[in-house]
Curated annotation (Swiss-Prot):
InterPro entries: G3P_acylTferase_PlsY. It comes from Nitrosococcus oceani (strain ATCC 19707 / BCRC 17464 / JCM 30415 / NCIMB 11848 / C-107). Pathway: Lipid metabolism; phospholipid metabolism. Its EC number is 2.3.1.275. Keywords: Cell inner membrane, Cell membrane, Lipid biosynthesis, Lipid metabolism, Membrane, Phospholipid biosynthesis, Phospholipid metabolism, Transferase, Transmembrane, Transmembrane helix. Belongs to the PlsY family. It catalyses: an acyl phosphate + sn-glycerol 3-phosphate = a 1-acyl-sn-glycero-3-phosphate + phosphate. This is Glycerol-3-phosphate acyltransferase. PANTHER family: GLYCEROL-3-PHOSPHATE ACYLTRANSFERASE-RELATED (PTHR30309:SF0), INNER MEMBRANE PROTEIN YGIH (PTHR30309). The gene is plsY. GO terms for cellular component: plasma membrane. HAMAP family: PlsY. It holds the Pfam family G3P_acyltransf. It is found in: Cell inner membrane. One of its GO terms (biological process) is phospholipid biosynthetic process.
Length: 197
C-alpha cells in the first residue's frame, strides 16, 4: 500500500514538471502562460516560433506521462494502481504544484499515459489525432476527436477495467480543459495551423 501511495504521489510530482514552462524559461522566451494562446504546451511553443523547442516540449510532456506508468508496472503494481499513477501524472500536468496549479491541457501527457497503459491504444489514438489534423489542420479539434474516441478504443483494445476507467477519466478531463477551444470551434474562430507548420 505504501509503495502504491509513493508511486501515485511521485507520478503527480513528475507530471507537475511543466516542460513548456521550463524549456521556455531556459530558452529566454518567458512564461508561455502569458504569451500566445496562454497554454503551456508544445503547440503554444510552436506558435511562439520554435519547432525545435516545441519538439522538446512534446517529448518531455509525453515522457512524464509514460515513465511513471512504466515504473509502476515494472515494480509489479496491480492494474488499479497503474491506473491511479497514470491519472496522477496527468493531473500533475493539468494542475502542477510547482507552477501555481496552472498547467496545460494534457494532450501529449495523456498520450504518454496511454502509451504506458497500452501501446496499441496509444497508436490508435495517435492515428485519430493525425488523421483529423491532416484533414482540418486544427490541433484542438484533433485532440477532442481523439479524446472522445479513446474510451471506445480502450474498451476494444484493453482488457483491464481499471485502465478502461482511467481512460474515461482522462478523456473527460481533457475535454474539460478544452472548453475555450470548443467555444471557438463552434463559433468558427479556432486557429488553424499554417501549412509551414
Amino acid at each position: 500500500m505504501l509503495t502504491i501511495l509513493v508511486l501515485v504521489i511521485g507520478g503527480y510530482f513528475v507530471g507537475s514538471l511543466s516542460s513548456a514552462i521550463i524549456v521556455a524559461r531556459l530558452a529566454g522566451l518567458g512564461d508561455p502562460r502569458t504569451q500566445g494562446s496562454g497554454n503551456p504546451g508544445a503547440t503554444n511553443i510552436l506558435r511562439l516560433g520554435s519547432k525545435r523547442l516545441a519538439g522538446i516540449v512534446l517529448l518531455g510532456d509525453a515522457l512524464k506521462g509514460f515513465l511513471p506508468v512504466w515504473l509502476a508496472q515494472e515494480v509489479g503494481a496491480n492494474a488499479w494502481a497503474v491506473a491511479g499513477v497514470g491519472l496522477a501524472a496527468f493531473w500533475g500536468h493539468l494542475y502542477p504544484v510547482f507552477f501555481g496549479f496552472r498547467g496545460g491541457k494534457g494532450v501529449a501527457t495523456g498520450l504518454g499515459v496511454l502509451l504506458g497503459f497500452s501501446w496499441s491504444l496509444a497508436l490508435a489514438v495517435l492515428g485519430i489525432w493525425l488523421s483529423i489534423f491532416w484533414c482540418w489542420r486544427i490541433s484542438s479539434l484533433s485532440a477532442l476527436c481523439a479524446a472522445i474516441l479513446a474510451p471506445f478504443l480502450a474498451w476494444w483494445l484493453v482488457p483491464d477495467s481499471a485502465i478502461r476507467f482511467a481512460v474515461v477519466l482522462l478523456a473527460i478531463f481533457l475535454l474539460w480543459r478544452h472548453q475555450d477551444n470548443i467555444r471557438r470551434l463552434l463559433s468558427g474562430q479556432e486557429d488553424r495551423a499554417s501549412k509551414q507548420n
